[in-house]
């Protein structure tokens, strides 16, 4: 070995030890001929010292050393002189007096500083990702990711799950997003697809009698990117036979609580995880992935709004819309600039605007004077009306009420955006708090207004609620609930799952409602339908995203910070310069030809 100890492992109790270290040179300081270097490896950094009076040869070499050179040093661990300790370093009580140094490799001047906070554009960091990953925060992120995955594997293995790998090259059966297609050289004109998820394969494993399966699965979706999406991503894929919904949720909660308390014990974890229905989440939070760290819960005030002469409210309700909003406690003192910010936020989300009421007095709302009730222009109502509004919404003197008008589902989108904005404006959330919740009983179908058809709310293999199978022949398909569930945390969806259909006739009926012809169904889903006729057991599962979970645990706004080699939002790999054109000979072998896309 080229080293006997890790740089970040040295402590006061190591004083007097003779050590050999190896790593990268960080900060350099010269003081009166004495050279101080921070030597860094994956474990951390330690100060190494070169004194020309005791080790002239080593000091001469150190004079040439520059940042990010790779060196090996030998020396003795000493306690730092009193007053020179560095509490910002884990090794700040000690230093290594060097007697010998060997340059293992030199380095060009890096395009950005390799330190805690790199003041560099993200595109530059991605272009030199191998340098970016040397920075302590990136190393911490990847280390945490490793511990998360290891905990998952150990947890499930201890509970009799089998880790089974499913194919990467599969048949194209689009699940909502576009497939990545892979041409077959041996069968010209035919294509494989990269899996968007191992959905059918894990269900077939249940038919196979595996009973408890998991894998850390790579998934691929050709979709537009954003901060929490990548073209390729990693999820825990988990499936169980002979279970009901609560069995899956109980296991998932146990997994998450144990994992978080093990790998990030400093996080403030709310437990147990509440379970709320989709309808309740939309009613209370205007979102199916609510952040429950704070209140600001919704109230439908359409009935009271109908008593006003406010044209916006009345025209909205005449068109089948609602008036909903929430109370912002203690914020009646918002000034004109702050109110304009709220109105701009409403319009940016797609809403026409925002109605507000501020109760600035100290008396009960019903006793406030006209001058103490600040209302949006056009909304002029007497104190008695405000008393009833305040009673319904739970508002009081000193509070502000925000109201929005519109038709669903857009109204909830606007309200959710406003709720999030207000929480950020008032700093209502603790970044170290993790507030998980299960959202259950999603609709089985969503109406696609553009295509004039029903789509699966989750995916077509989701089972309807018990007792609602007969309603599949009716006209109120939007009222049918499913055995689908999501795990959400701090306003993000972390996992999605369901109890699956395991009966061919029911599965074919779902496909028919979704508009798939019998020929299409047989072509795309024939194997799993046939398998259902050979004793398929009741089964269900869940698929937590690894990238998003680790990003939340790390406090990162982007999953790119927890993936070793991510793509940009345009799907470009800046390090390897992918995608790129390929050699025409490769296209010829695949029987492919590039054609110009018509305007």
Label for each model-derived stretch:
Residues 1-599:
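Class II aminoacyl-tRNA synthetase catalytic cores and aaRS-like
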């Amino acid at each position: 070995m080229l080293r006997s100890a890790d740089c970040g492992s040295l402590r006061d109790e190591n004083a007097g030890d003779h050590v050999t270290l190896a790593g990268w040179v960080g900060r350099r300081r010269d003081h009166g001929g004495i050279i101080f270097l921070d030597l860094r490896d994956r474990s951390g950094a330690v100060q190494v010292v070169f004194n020309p009076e005791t080790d002239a040869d080593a000091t001469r070499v150190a004079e040439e050393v520059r940042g990010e050179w790779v060196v090996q040093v030998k020396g003795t661990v000493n306690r730092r002189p009193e007053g020179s300790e560095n509490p910002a370093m884990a090794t700040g009580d000690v230093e290594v007096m060097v007697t010998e140094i060997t340059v293992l490799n030199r380095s060009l001047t890096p395009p950005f500083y390799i330190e805690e906070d790199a003041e560099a554009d993200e595109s530059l960091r991605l272009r030199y990702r191998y340098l970016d990953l040397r920075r302590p925060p990136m190393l911490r992120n990847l280390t945490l990711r490793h511990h998360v995955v290891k905990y998952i594997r150990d947890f499930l293995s201890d509970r009799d799950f089998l880790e089974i790998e499913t194919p990467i090259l599969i048949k194209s059966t689009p699940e909502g997003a576009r497939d990545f297609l892979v041409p077959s050289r041996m069968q010209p004109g035919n294509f494989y697809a990269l899996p968007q998820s191992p959905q059918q394969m894990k269900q077939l494993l249940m038919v196979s009698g595996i009973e408890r399966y998991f894998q850390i699965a790579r998934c691929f979706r050709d979709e537009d990117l954003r901060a929490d999406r990548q073209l390729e991503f990693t999820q825990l894929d988990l499936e169980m036979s002979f279970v009901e919904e609560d069995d899956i949720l109980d296991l998932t909660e146990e997994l998450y609580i144990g994992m978080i308390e093990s790998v990030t014990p400093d996080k403030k974890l709310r437990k147990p995880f509440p379970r709320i229905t989709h309808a309740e989440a939309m009613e209370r939070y205007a979102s199916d992935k609510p952040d429950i760290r704070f209140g600001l819960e919704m109230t439908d005030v359409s009935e009271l709004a109908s008593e006003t002469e406010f044209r916006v409210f009345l025209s909205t309700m005449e068109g089948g819309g609602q008036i909903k909003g929430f109370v912002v406690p203690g914020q009646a003192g918002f000034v004109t600039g702050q109110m304009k910010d709220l109105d701009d936020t409403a319009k940016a989300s797609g809403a026409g605007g925002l109605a507000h009421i501020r109760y600035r007095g100290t008396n009960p709302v019903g006793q406030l004077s006209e001058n103490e009730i600040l209302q949006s222009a056009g909304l002029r109502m007497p104190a008695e009306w405000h008393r009833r509004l305040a009673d319904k919404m739970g508002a009081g003197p000193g509070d502000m009420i925000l109201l929005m008008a519109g038709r669903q589902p857009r109204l909830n989108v606007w309200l959710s955006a406003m709720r999030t904005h207000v929480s950020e404006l008032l700093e209502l959330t603790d970044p170290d708090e993790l507030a998980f919740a299960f959202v259950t009983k999603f609709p089985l179908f969503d109406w696609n207004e553009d295509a004039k058809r029903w789509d699966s709310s989750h995916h077509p293999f989701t089972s309807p609620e018990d007792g609602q199978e007969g309603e599949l022949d009716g006209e109120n398909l939007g009222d049918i609930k499913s055995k689908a569930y999501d795990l959400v945390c701090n306003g993000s969806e972390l996992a999605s799952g369901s109890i699956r259909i395991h009966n061919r006739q029911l599965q074919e009926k779902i496909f028919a409602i979704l508009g798939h012809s019998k020929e299409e169904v047989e072509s795309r889903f024939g194997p799993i339908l046939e398998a259902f006729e050979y004793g398929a057991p009741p089964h269900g599962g869940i698929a937590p995203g690894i990238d998003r979970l680790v990003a939340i645990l790390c406090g990162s706004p982007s999953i790119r910070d927890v993936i070793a080699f991510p793509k940009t939002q345009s799907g470009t790999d800046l390090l390897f310069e992918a995608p790129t054109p390929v050699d025409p000979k490769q296209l010829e072998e695949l029987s492919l030809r590039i054609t110009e896309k018509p305007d």
